[in-house]
Design a protein with these regions (language model features):
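Short, locally clustered residues in the helix-turn-helix/winged-helix DNA-binding domain
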Residues: 26, 54-58, 118
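C-terminal regulatory/oligomerization modules of transcriptional regulators
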Residues: 1-13, 134-160
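N-terminal leader segment of winged-helix/HTH proteins
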Residues: 1-43
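N-terminal helix-turn-helix DNA-binding core of bacterial DNA-binding proteins
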Residues: 34-77
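A structural signal for well-ordered alpha-helices, especially hydrophobic packing surfaces
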Residues: 29, 114, 148-152
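Short amphipathic alpha-helix starts
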Residues: 27-28, 76, 107
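Charged, amphipathic alpha-helical coiled-coil/dimerization segments
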Residues: 33, 83-142
Length: 160
């Protein structure tokens, strides 16, 4: 294991140190997504499906417009993934009161998949962060939050 003190030298945040952070993000994200990726691969889904299932599960009756705002993808990109999830009965589509708004809800099948995928990631995160104190964890969360662009921080705040 790399010596964390060698990885973290905040007084000398030069390009070399920033590149270490880039690499840490790459490797941690790769490992963070690897468990769910294996499950998704078995049902011929990918990370785009995972993101849609996650956010539809997080907020019941999420509109397509809201989902597009969260994911920041085009309607065309969402359409392919969403149609597959609806056709395979992971997501239920309902028409809003004004007949123009489409609302998304996870089906029982979708809830089960979302839980299965999230449980892996929650467990992975918990097994790491339980070794740190609240100050360290909040510092980590603060860094991640500040890496989000201002307008996207508002989206994050709205869903939390």
């Amino acid at each position: 294991m790399a010596d964390l003190n060698k990885l973290l030298t905040p007084l000398f945040l030069n390009e070399k140190e920033i590149r270490k952070i880039i690499e840490l993000m790459f490797f941690s994200y790769r490992d963070f997504t690897s468990g769910p990726d294996k499950i998704l691969e078995k049902i011929k889904f990918g990370r785009a499906h995972h993101r849609v299932i996650y956010f539809v599960g997080k907020r019941e009756n999420l509109t397509i417009k809201e989902l597009l705002s969260i994911l920041q993808i085009t309607k065309q990109s969402l359409s392919r993934v969403l149609n597959q999830l609806v056709n395979e009965k992971y997501i239920l589509l309902s028409i809003g009161e004004d007949k123009r708004t489409k609302k998304l809800i996870l089906s029982k099948k979708g809830q089960e998949l979302e839980k299965k995928l999230s449980d892996i990631q929650i467990s992975n995160i918990f097994n790491v962060i339980k070794k740190f104190d609240e100050v360290d964890i909040n510092g980590f969360k603060k860094i991640l939050y500040k890496m989000i662009k201002k307008d996207n921080q508002k989206i994050f705040d709205d869903i939390n």
